[in-house]
């Protein structure tokens, strides 16, 4: 398969994730869309790494996945805390957490 097709797929995944972040109000769905955008960037990094014949992009993508795993833990903890206090997972309620 042509490597350019992987870049098109990465752009499509990023666009889907960006539209989900802009349109949705549920914090879990927004969080999943952010992760989709992050995985699209990883796919582009690995594709460019493969096209240029070095491992730099793959190493960066690996470390990005490690950081994303930590982000998932912290992000879901915040969402669960928001849900327990407000009984809703809406991002509009997140601004009320400071009260």
Swiss-Prot record:
The chain crosses the membrane at residues 3-23, 28-48, 59-79. It catalyses: a quinone + NADH + 5 H(+)(in) = a quinol + NAD(+) + 4 H(+)(out). Keywords: Cell membrane, Membrane, NAD, Quinone, Translocase, Transmembrane, Transmembrane helix, Transport. Belongs to the complex I subunit 4L family. The keyword Transmembrane applies. This is NADH-quinone oxidoreductase subunit K 1. It is an enzyme of class 7 (translocase). GO terms for cellular component: NADH dehydrogenase complex; plasma membrane. GO terms for molecular function: NADH:ubiquinone reductase (non-electrogenic) activity; quinone binding. NCBIfam families: PRK05715.1-2. One of its GO terms (biological process) is ATP synthesis coupled electron transport. NDH-1 shuttles electrons from NADH, via FMN and iron-sulfur (Fe-S) centers, to quinones in the respiratory chain. The immediate electron acceptor for the enzyme in this species is believed to be a menaquinone. Couples the redox reaction to proton translocation (for every two electrons transferred, four hydrogen ions are translocated across the cytoplasmic membrane), and thus conserves the redox energy in a proton gradient. NDH-1 is composed of 14 different subunits. Subunits NuoA, H, J, K, L, M, N constitute the membrane sector of the complex. It is found in: Cell membrane. Pfam families: Oxidored_q2 (PF00420). Its EC number is 7.1.1.-. It is a multi-pass membrane protein.
């Amino acid at each position: 398969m042509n490597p350019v097709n992987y870049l098109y797929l990465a752009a499509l995944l990023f666009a889907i994730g960006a539209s989900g972040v802009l349109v949705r109000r549920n914090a879990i769905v927004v969080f999943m869309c952010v992760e989709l955008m992050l995985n699209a960037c990883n796919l582009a990094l690995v594709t460019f790494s493969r096209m240029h014949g070095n491992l730099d992009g793959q190493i960066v993508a690996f470390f990005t996945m490690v950081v994303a795993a930590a982000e998932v833990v912290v992000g879901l903890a915040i969402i669960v805390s928001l849900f327990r206090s407000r009984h809703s997972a809406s991002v509009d309620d997140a601004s009320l957490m400071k009260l």
